[in-house]
Amino acid sequence: MTDDSRSIELEVEVPGTPEEIWAAVATGPGIGSWFVPSTVEEREGGELVQQFGPGDSMTVRGRVRIWDPPHRVVFDGGDEGVGMAFEWLVEARHGGTCVVRLVHSGFGSGEEWNDQFDGLDAGWRMFLHNLGLHRRYFPGQVGVAVQPLGMAAVGLDEAWGTLTGALGIPAAPSEGDQVAAGPDAPTALAGTVERAVPRKLTLRIHEPGPGTAVVAVEGTDGQAAISVWFWLYGADASDRAPALLEGWQRWLADLFPVPD
């Protein structure tokens, strides 16, 4: 059962025209530049396909329920009134910016939904901040998402300590700090801390290339999801992405091995 009164409602102000911001939140290349690789049939009733990690099990399919460019798009699972829905609203402001509003609805009632609600709320805050970085520093460009992901049956704080220790970066840096991974990381990783909250860092990077990155531990104690995600820009970003994914995916698997 879903609770119509329970939804995540967030907004962020980003630079750009409504048409530019629409492209960022309603089209496949735009969404993939700050969130996850996506394809969108740009019409009402069209298909949405999103890839949340390596493998077919991480592919999620949905529907374009409402398509009203450049101001409103709604994605859902395809069944009217059932499951989650994601409404994006774009409103122009003076000075060349727009407010992007997200309404994520369709949560179930009951305490068993609390962890998922809180986790998704925190995740959306992280990704909306990344949307702002995409528009602020890489306007007019398309980013390539690279999504190494690990899992660990440990507490979240323990996983964060293990991850940051292996990377050789501070566990609690301040915004504006410069950080760089140490020699044990599979590739270079260096940049400016743009956002720092418990167990989540967002970086504007210059290594392994221009772009943004997220270092995060999410989930619940005993089911920790570990991410070192990149959004790369530049003419060779697509060429560099497969090797980057392979190297970091292997590194995370070695750092957080699955018990026999």
Where are these regions (language model features)?
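Short acidic N-proximal helix/loop "leader" segments that mark the beginning
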Residues: 1-7
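Surface-exposed beta-loop interaction hotspot
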Residues: 106-164
